[in-house]
Amino acid sequence: MRESLKKLLHIEDTPERTALAFSIGIFLGFSPFLGLHTLAGLAVAFLFKLNRVAILLGVWSNTPWWLVPFYTFATWLGMWVIRFRIDWATLERMFQLGKEKGFLTSEFWMQIASQWGLLASFLTGSLILALLLSLIAYPLSLN
């Protein structure tokens, strides 16, 4: 049983492969694809036969405490990169709609979707920061 578990989890990988799995997990955990991080991590781990524990530790390093500050900064970075501007009145209107109608309503998300630049900024900034964090994580986890 113990040997089967080791094979399933790929615990006995080389340090380089374990560090790679962790850094891929970091990338996926901080990617903009909210709600799919764990599934994506497991899919990548099984597809490339990587250390499942290391990849999940990387994915789960983006805790709820980090979500708002990270994605706020990522969106700001994306806005700077793609040169997108949005006025505060529009942001306030969207936030007010979310508070009144609910952040999970189709009306709120239709308003968000109408601001394509905001979504593009979110995606761009999140991918840049996720890549940067994963590149930092590899050498740190290797040592």
What do these predicted regions represent?
Residues 4-28:
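Small-residue-enriched transmembrane helix starts and helix-helix packing motifs
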Residues 3-11, 63-82:
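Hydrophobic alpha-helical transmembrane segments
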Residues 31-44, 48-74:
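Transmembrane helix boundary and interhelical junction motifs in multipass membrane proteins
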